[in-house]
């Protein structure tokens, strides 16, 4: 009986280095999801595979401070710092949501030194779809 050929990078023989760290990504897509409670920044390659991500919560902000512009700026800086180290030079930015961190995250992305192809607002807007929830009485 023949022995199976060991595959490089398989789980059995143990990886020496992570596959994500070895990739060089010249161009990527930065997704910013800004809600009223938190801001999530995800960096993907052009095929949509996640390379790096960060949020205001993982950046050390808790409670109502997660929704602040400063928290969004910190989260964007943390997510982008890792991909700039991996060699990313150009990026497209997709911004989604009504949160306070939209502009602050974009400001942090612009300051990072990446060349931005375009900035697109992809906030979902209903064409009179579902009935919205009732108004809050505070």
From Swiss-Prot:
InterPro entries: Ribosomal_uS11 (IPR001971), Ribosomal_uS11_bac-type (IPR019981), Ribosomal_uS11_CS (IPR018102), Ribosomal_uS11_sf (IPR036967). One of its GO terms (cellular component) is chloroplast. GO terms for biological process: translation. Pfam families: Ribosomal_S11. Keywords: Chloroplast, Plastid, Ribonucleoprotein, Ribosomal protein, RNA-binding, rRNA-binding. SUPFAM superfamilies: Translational machinery components. It comes from the Eukaryota. Residues 9-24 have a biased composition (Basic residues). Residues 1-24 are annotated as: Disordered. GO terms for molecular function: rRNA binding; structural constituent of ribosome. PROSITE patterns: RIBOSOMAL_S11. The keyword Transcription regulation does not apply. Belongs to the universal ribosomal protein uS11 family. Part of the 30S ribosomal subunit. This is Small ribosomal subunit protein uS11c.
């Amino acid at each position: 009986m023949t022995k199976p050929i060991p595959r490089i990078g398989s789980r059995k023989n143990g990886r020496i280095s992570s596959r994500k760290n070895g990739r060089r990504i010249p161009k990527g897509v930065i997704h910013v999801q800004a809600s009223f409670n938190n801001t999530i920044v995800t960096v993907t390659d052009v095929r949509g595979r996640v390379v790096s991500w960060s949020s205001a919560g993982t950046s050390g902000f808790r409670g109502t401070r997660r929704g602040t512009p400063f928290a969004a700026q910190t989260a964007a800086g943390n997510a982008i710092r890792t991909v700039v180290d991996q060699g990313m030079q150009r990026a497209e930015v997709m911004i989604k949501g009504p949160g306070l961190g939209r502009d602050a995250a974009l400001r942090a992305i612009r300051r990072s030194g990446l060349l931005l192809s375009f900035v697109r607002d992809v906030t979902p807007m209903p064409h009179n779809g579902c009935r919205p929830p009732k108004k809050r009485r505070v």
